[in-house]
Amino acid sequence: MRSHTGLRALVAPGCSLLLLYLLAATRPDRAVGDPADSAFTSLPVREEMMAKYANLSLETYNISLTEQTRVSEQNITLERPSHLELECTFTATEDVMSMNVTWKKDDALLETTDGFNTTKMGDTLYSQYRFTVFNSKQMGKYSCFLGEELRGTFNIRVPKVHGKNKPLITYVGDSTVLKCECQNCLPLNWTWYMSNGTAQVPIDVHVNDKFDINGSYANETKLKVKHLLEEDGGSYWCRAAFPLGESEEHIKLVVLSFMVPLKPFLAIIAEVILLVAIILLCEVYTQKKKNDPDDGKEFEQIEQLKSDDSNGIENNVPRYRKTDSGDQ
């Protein structure tokens, strides 16, 4: 009540109607949208983009070409939106004033805009291309062509994810941990995938308690696979998401059964048994060969005795002298 009384005291009776008109004119109509009102409450798209990318850092990269080095490449890693300035420099003994300069993104020719700047000073040519990388569409391969034989290429990509290069070998019933990391970078998030034979399937730890996903630091991720079965072996992928794109790494998991580690021992046992059998056969053959000469000697002795006996009988038979037929 006191507040209304005070208001009436401040407003003169003759000004009451004027005040009501002013209030009605300045009151926003919520039923009907006012374009001017929306323009007042939100920035235009261009101003919003300018404000969003005003604080981006400028990164400069240079490739130097010579008559000896006519083709050169450079890899650029970008984690977040940035302003880029790519520069190709060519120094030659010949005149470079008549040399034509073009830029391409992948295989598409880039149109000449304010971002291009080519300067020729004596025997040196400088060509710059400045632009803003704010999404994955600006990533790729940028090349400067100086004439027909000189080329400098900038490969712009997101940070690379590193995992285990060799297959990870484990056994049925065990648990294992697959790890991926990104050096000197901070991904927005990590996602794990496994192969179902034909495609990559996201791993959801909330649905399948066989998996656990964690990491001690933001630039790494770990996938724990529990109670391994042979069918759990196969291909796994870790994927890191960045503001400018994604990067993934492939990890091979091999799950062996209990018989697999026993196979080498069984093979050794089989080899030992075979070796022992060969040794025994050799011993039997050698022993038999030793016995065979004795039997031969006995046979020879018997034959010799028979021969001697026959000779003795022949010697005991009386011999008769032959006489001439005339004497008879």
Curated annotation (Swiss-Prot):
Q: What is this protein called?
A: Embigin
Spell out the subcellular localization from the entry: Cell membrane; Synapse
Q: Where are the transmembrane segments?
A: 265-285
So which residues are the signal peptide here? 1-33
- Give any GO molecular function from the UniProt entry: cell-cell adhesion mediator activity
Biological processes, Gene Ontology terms: axon guidance; cell adhesion; dendrite self-avoidance; homophilic cell adhesion via plasma membrane adhesion molecules; plasma membrane lactate transport
Name the cystine pairs.
88-144, 180-238
Subunit info here reads:
Interacts with SLC16A1, SLC16A6 and SLC16A7.
What tissues contain this protein? Detected in prostate, mammary gland and erythrocytes (at protein level). Detected in testis, brain, prostate, heart, kidney, liver, mammary gland and lung.
Q: Does the keyword Ribonucleoprotein apply?
A: no
Q: Which domain of life is it from?
A: Eukaryota
Record's bilayer topology term: Single-pass type I membrane protein
Q: What is its main location?
A: membrane
